[in-house]
């Protein structure tokens, strides 16, 4: 055992730091209580939400309305300009701009004088206050009503920036450190300095062609390295700044900004907080202008020569991101990755399944030295969604130019940039900007202007498919519910239910939905350019619906298949709404110039794979992430889990625990079952993570563990857990004094899931107590429906105030009065 002088405090502090971060709360409401674990939505709220019109229906309702011609500025924080519901609203100032602080609960309403009837788009200047890692969510109401369902879920992103390290570049054999420094300064790294024989400089705020060439030549990296030269993921921090949000669909199904119909005169605009605080600087109602097409854009810059610069932007060094979950990733699958190295961890890409949700974005900043037309080329990989192209919207922002100047941008440069396509392929690809066809797009860039390119996840052409499939799924689900109301979940296959006579509308609707799915399958094939497993899924469900809708005899025998396919369609819908894309780099290059290769030749690929195979025998995975060698004063921690979890834990140690305690941690990833032999050999760790709670006492009674209740902050830390979670980790000694030998890593908690559509259809409120749940059973059973009840006995025991163990854990407590009563209550639920 190492470091006995630091053993107890180190073990305790490390456990507390990690476990508090992982803590999940056990929430079981007592009988008859209505705590925060239950929904507060009433039946009327649920019906309003389910029956709300979509934006498509809202636009159809106001199809004859014209766009407004004037812009209206809302007085956001003037005296008497607004009314609030809730506490915490106040006027604040950020970066010289005054705004109204809105907390994460409550609502604020502004009264706006509109000069004319018409359609208005809305933009909000906001400042995301530092808080949790989640995005900001708001509900918009116009004249005290939510105008359409999509306005219930407005998501405003925060601004996150990685804390990159200074690059350290060693001079080559034929140059000195001073010569290398001079070259770095000439390239634009003006802060370059010589330290310990290396040239050190910070990551630039804006990449230029000269900087890009210098970085490629000298393999410049801005990540912290561990003792084995593996790159470590940088810390991402919120970097609040004033940002502009244009009200649009958070799901990404609708590419255009929302337009709201407002009548002339007084109107009320309300924002209701759902998640996270923010400060509102301004709200503007403005007439939405159509974005020019690429044809119009290219005519504007017709005759412009090609630019001369080439700037490679490594995606892992993005300037900013919308979420903390967007961080650099390692990919060693290809010899042409930039950079590629199989001997160590190199964080050379960004995205993947971390960059797949609508609204997520990353930004990269650059400048070119010569004006002209440029191709924006990306090297990417999309091997997740078979037969589905993923989509990104590209926004360009220019700094220092004003509207009307050549090369000025303040959003999407042309309409097609809202739906840039990245096709499916199992290999890496390189392509110019395109919308899924052979036609590519060029952009004009002004010289010496700082440009920021934002790539945002959107559904693009898949948005219409997703919206249609969602509507079809709703119809099919309603048809299924109508059938089981008559037949029950297990119908009699020998009975003639007479579906065509008893529910003709349902039979007709199944045929209608089959035709819609057939059309959607053709549409999906056209988008992807080929048939896929997803197309086959839609066609299969369409055939099933057509059979059931046209023949009564096929309904009962296919009912279970219909239920299964409803789930399959839901899975397809979920997959189609994700847009994963792994990005290696973006290259700004002269229009028409040769694109870089996407994949290596045979010899390059063979050498890359053989080198990786050979290195796998010698790579030290245990020390990955360690910033210093193990010593007698370090704490040895064993972790029995996956490697990605060990990396997360190593980041917590490096960024939080060690800097705050000055205690080194030797983290080792081990296989399960290694603890027992190590203890027998007297070579066990100081801390072990991943031990089953049932094994803790087995080790404790054999004096293999130390008790932890003697630490000053034990009571405060243990209070974060339920008594039941701590009971299994402790035992009494001969003097009947309770000792504890560990802390829970995770806690489970029961949850109740309800079908809001079913409850609304049957006019049932969401049950909040067991009595209310019991009251729902007759109505459900009358419609051949049931409640899926839990068989977890402990929740009934705890809700009655009982304990699982008696006599301080020495015997089971199931034979007590409260234990028997709890068991009886659970059993009674299955006899109704």
Name what the model sees in each region.
Residues 655-724, 757-765:
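Extracytoplasmic "Venus flytrap"/periplasmic binding protein-like
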Residues 291, 666-670, 709-712, 729-832:
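Helix-loop-helix "hinge/cap" segment bordering the ligand-binding cleft or interdomain interface
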Residues 1-42:
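Gram-positive cell-envelope targeting signals
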Residues 616-636, 736-737, 760, 778-785:
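Immediate post-signal peptide segment of exported/extracytoplasmic ligand-binding proteins
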Residues 591-633:
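Disordered inhibitory propeptide/activation segment of secreted metzincin zinc metalloprotease zymogens
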Residues 270-271, 686-690, 788:
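Paired acidic/hydrophobic, glycine-rich loop segments that form the ligand-binding mouth/hinge
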Residues 630-643, 657, 663-668, 687, ...:
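Short, well-ordered beta-strand elements
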Residues 30-564, 568-574, 578-583:
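Extracytoplasmic
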């Amino acid at each position: 055992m190492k470091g006995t002088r630091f053993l107890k405090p180190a073990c305790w502090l490390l456990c507390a730091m990690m476990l508090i971060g992982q803590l999940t709360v056990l929430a079981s409401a007592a009988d008859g209580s209505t705590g925060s674990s239950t929904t507060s939505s009433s039946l009327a709220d649920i019906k309003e939400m389910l029956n709300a019109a979509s934006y498509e229906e809202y636009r159809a309702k106001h199809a004859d309305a014209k766009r407004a011609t004037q812009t209206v500025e809302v007085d956001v924080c003037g005296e008497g300009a607004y009314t609030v519901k809730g506490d915490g609203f106040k006027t604040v100032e950020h970066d010289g701009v005054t705004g109204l602080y809105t907390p994460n609960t409550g609502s604020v309403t502004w009264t706006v004088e509109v000069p004319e009837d018409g359609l208005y788009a809305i933009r909000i200047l906001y400042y995301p206050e530092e808080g949790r890692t989640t995005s900001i969510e708001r509900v918009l109401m116009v004249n005290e009503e939510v105008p359409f369902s999509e306005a219930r879920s407005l998501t405003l992103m925060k601004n996150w920036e990685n804390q990159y390290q200074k690059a350290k570049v060693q001079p080559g054999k034929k140059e000195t450190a001073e010569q290398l420094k001079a070259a770095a300064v000439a390239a634009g790294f003006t802060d370059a300095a010589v330290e310990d024989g290396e040239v050190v400089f910070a990551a630039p705020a804006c990449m230029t062609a000269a900087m890009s060439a210098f970085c490629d030549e000298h393999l410049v990296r801005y990540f912290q390295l561990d003792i084995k030269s593996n790159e470590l993921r940088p810390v991402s921090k919120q970097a609040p700044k004033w940002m502009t949000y244009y009200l649009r669909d958070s799901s990404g199904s609708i590419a255009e900004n929302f337009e709201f119909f407002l009548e002339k005169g007084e109107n009320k605009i309300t924002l209701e907080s759902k998640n996270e605080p923010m400060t509102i600087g301004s709200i503007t109602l403005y007439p939405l202008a159509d974005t020019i097409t690429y044809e119009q854009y290219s005519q504007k810059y017709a005759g412009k020569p090609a630019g001369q610069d080439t700037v490679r932007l490594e995606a892992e060094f993005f300037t900013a991101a919308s979420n903390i979950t967007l961080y650099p990733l390692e990919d060693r699958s290809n010899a042409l990755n930039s950079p590629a190295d199989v001997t160590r961890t190199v964080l050379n890409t960004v995205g993947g399944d971390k960059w797949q949700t609508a609204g997520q974005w990353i930004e990269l900043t650059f400048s070119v030295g010569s004006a002209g037309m440029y191709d924006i080329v990306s090297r990417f990989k999309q091997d997740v969604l078979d037969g589905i192209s993923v989509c990104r919207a590209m926004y360009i922002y220019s700094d220092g130019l004003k509207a009307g100047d050549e090369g000025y941008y303040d959003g999407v440069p042309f309409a097609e940039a809202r739906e840039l396509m990245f096709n499916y392929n199992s290999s890496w690809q390189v392509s110019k900007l395109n919308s899924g066809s052979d036609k590519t797009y060029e952009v004009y860039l002004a010289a010496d202007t700082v440009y920021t390119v934002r790539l945002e996840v959107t559904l693009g052409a898949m948005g219409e498919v997703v919206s249609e499939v969602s509507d079809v799924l709703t119809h099919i689900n309603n048809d299924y519910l109508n059938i089981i109301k008559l037949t029950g979940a297990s119908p009699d296959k020998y009975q003639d239910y007479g579906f065509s006579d008893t529910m003709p509308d349902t039979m007709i609707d199944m045929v209608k939905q089959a035709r819609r799915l057939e059309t959607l399958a053709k549409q999906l094939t056209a988008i992807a350019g080929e048939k896929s497993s997803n197309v086959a899924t839609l066609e299969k469900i369409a055939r099933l619906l057509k059979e059931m809708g046209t023949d009564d005899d096929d309904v009962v025998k296919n009912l279970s298949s219909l239920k299964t396919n409803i789930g399959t369609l839901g899975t397809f819908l979920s997959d189609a709404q994700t847009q994963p894309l792994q990005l290696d780099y973006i290259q700004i290059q002269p229009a028409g110039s040769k694109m870089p290769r996407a994949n290596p030749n045979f010899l390059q690929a063979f050498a890359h794979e053989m080198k990786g195979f050979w290195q796998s025998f010698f790579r030290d995975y245990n020390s990955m992430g360690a910033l210093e060698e193990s010593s007698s004063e370090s704490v040895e921690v064993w972790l029995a889990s996956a490697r990605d979890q060990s990396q997360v834990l190593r980041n917590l140690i490096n960024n939080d625990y060690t800097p705050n305690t000055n205690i080194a941690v030797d983290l080792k990833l081990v296989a399960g079952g290694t603890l027992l032999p190590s203890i027998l050999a007297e070579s066990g760790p100081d801390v072990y993570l991943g031990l089953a709670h049932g094994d803790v006492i087995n080790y404790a009674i054999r004096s293999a563990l130390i008790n932890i209740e003697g630490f000053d902050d034990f009571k405060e830390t243990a209070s974060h857990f339920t008594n039941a979670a701590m009971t299994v980790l402790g035992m009494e000694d001969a003097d009947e004094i309770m000792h504890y030998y560990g802390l829970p890593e995770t806690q489970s908690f029961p949850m109740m899931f309800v079908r809001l559509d079913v409850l609304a259809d049957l006019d049932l409120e969401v049950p909040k107590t067991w009595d209310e749940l019991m009251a729902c059973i007759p109505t459900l059973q009358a419609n051949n429906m049931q409640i899926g009840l839990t068989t977890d006995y402990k929740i009934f025991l705890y809700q009655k105030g009982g304990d699982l163990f008696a006599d301080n854990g020495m015997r089971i407590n199931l034979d007590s009065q409260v234990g028997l009563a709890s068991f009886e209550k659970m059993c009674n639920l299955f006899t109704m």
